[in-house]
Amino acid sequence: MSRLLIIILTLAITFTTHAFDRENLMKAWSSSVVIRGYTDDGLAYGSGVVVAKDKVVTNCHVLRKTKSPWVSFGDTSFPVTGVQADRWHDLCLLSVFNLPVEPVPLGNSKNLKKGQEIVGIGHSGGAPVALTTGGNIIATYDFEGENIILSSAKFRMGASGSGLFDLKGNLIGITTFKTTGYGNYYSLPADWIKPLMKKEVETVFPINGKALWEEDEDKKPYFLKIAIPKTKKNWAELELVTKEWVEHEPNNTEAWYELGYAYEKLNKVADALVAYDKALEIDQNNSDALLREAVIY
């Protein structure tokens, strides 16, 4: 059997569609709420997900400019009485008085597969009714013991703090930030929510503090360092960054894939194939590396 045929058959298996659980996804949709609060400039808003009785998870950056946030569900508002904050991971858990919303089950980021279908549910633009968007897992990146999720599930302003769900309705991530230029959207792992529940409750707003994705460029993790050169199509710079990445993380399949992509864009085809092969040696289901090899062959 030829190498190209093997690649095509593997890709066909990798991209198999999974069935979705309509009932549990509707429950996930019903768990989405709006976070609001007045600021010096007007009204701030974001999204949140009910993850326990009277507990709503959102992004801390949603709470930076308001002294008195509240939660809206439908046409009813509920006061926020406290918050447990993990500023660096940009996750805040709000205590909400008498919130009549069922919590969603928490999933995890460890078992996610590249290409897996997912659903984003949130309140883009501050819309009172939750909006849904479909997408796929592009990659997961190990960061401080858990996996930050890169997906194609689009979101706009107001969706920060919204939920990313698998097709069974489990919360797998919290939609947080995106990179301009090449349409990739990052979610923080739901795995960080349980440790958040153990933090001390604070009662003073606003919540300030730098988040991981706001780190100085030279201190960012490599999966964020590649964003600017990819956006600017600066393939030589991408080659430099990804060479450093594979040197520091030689067993990272995504690092080798990105190096291969840089080589391919620089017409270093032989080097690209070596890098893609290395990515597949680490993870034989790396569908991006498989696809690029299929294109080359």
Task: Map each language-model feature to its residues.
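Helix-start (N-cap) detector for alpha-helical repeat units in TPR-like alpha-solenoids
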Residues: 219, 253-254, 287-288
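Active-site region of chymotrypsin-like
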Residues: 28-39, 92-103, 129-201
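Conserved active-site neighborhood of the chymotrypsin/trypsin-like protease fold
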Residues: 41-45, 52-130, 145-148, 157, ...
